[in-house]
């Protein structure tokens, strides 16, 4: 191999590494914004903070823009550098992760919109506790899986993947609790229905965190997870919420 050829290979490798570093930085930035969006959306619900709910909604275009930036950068990198094997999986994986983060952000935005819509409605504080607990679990899972993505930690990613059933079970329990409150006092019906949709949004966030775990597995192992994803029993969900 000539010195010129070696120099070109080294230059290409360095350029690809630079591209990957930029992609990784943008994914991390997007992950941080989405984590904040989840926390703020639930806090807005707990505190009846319409202004915070509006800020959650206003953050969504920034997250969408980052998702497009990562996708464009990955496509350009693939076209320019023509990566193979693990390098190609890095680009494909980043696009997948950002797609799931964007969807999580959408679900947080939905909660923000419900906070704004509820405003001065009858708002029993005790009904929100289950949503708080569920969101704390999903937020912890998202943080764990993003750390797993950053460090390519397969075991940590699999722990999140296996934890999806816990989120589903918590959602079912919360639905049953809210149905009980609705039967006890008709004044609770409107607010409980809003909370059911919020809970379903949070459950969907957990599904997307599990998708990210599957992406980490694909990036590390070079193949998809073949086992069936653990899922809780959702037969008690009202049909309208399931279709959301």
Kindly give the residue locations of the regions a language model identified.
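Cytosolic, long alpha-helical scaffolding segments
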Residues: 1-244
């Amino acid at each position: 191999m000539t010195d010129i050829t070696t120099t070109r290979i080294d230059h290409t490798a360095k350029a690809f590494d630079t591209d990957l570093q930029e992609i990784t930085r943008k994914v991390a930035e997007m992950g941080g914004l989405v984590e904040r969006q989840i926390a703020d959306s639930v806090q807005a619900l707990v505190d009846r903070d319409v202004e915070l709910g509006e800020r959650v909604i206003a953050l969504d275009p920034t997250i969408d823009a980052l998702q497009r930036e990562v996708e464009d950068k990955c496509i350009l990198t693939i076209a320019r550098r023509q990566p193979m094997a693990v390098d190609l999986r890095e680009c494909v994986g980043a696009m997948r992760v950002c797609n799931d983060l964007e969807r999580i952000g959408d679900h947080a935005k939905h909660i923000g919109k419900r906070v704004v819509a509820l405003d001065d409605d009858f708002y029993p504080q005790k009904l929100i506790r289950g949503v708080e607990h569920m969101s704390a679990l999903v937020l912890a899972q998202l943080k764990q899986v993003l750390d797993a993505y950053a460090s390519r930690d397969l075991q940590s990613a699999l722990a999140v993947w296996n934890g999806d059933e816990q989120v589903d079970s918590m959602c079912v329990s919360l639905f049953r609790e809210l149905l009980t409150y609705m039967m006890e006092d008709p004044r609770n019906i409107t607010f409980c229905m809003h909370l059911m949709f919020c809970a379903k949004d949070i459950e969907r966030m957990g599904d997307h965190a599990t998708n990210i775990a599957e992406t980490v597995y694909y990036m590390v192992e070079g193949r998809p997870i073949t086992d069936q994803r653990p899922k809780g029993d959702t037969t008690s969900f009202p049909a309208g919420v399931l279709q959301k």
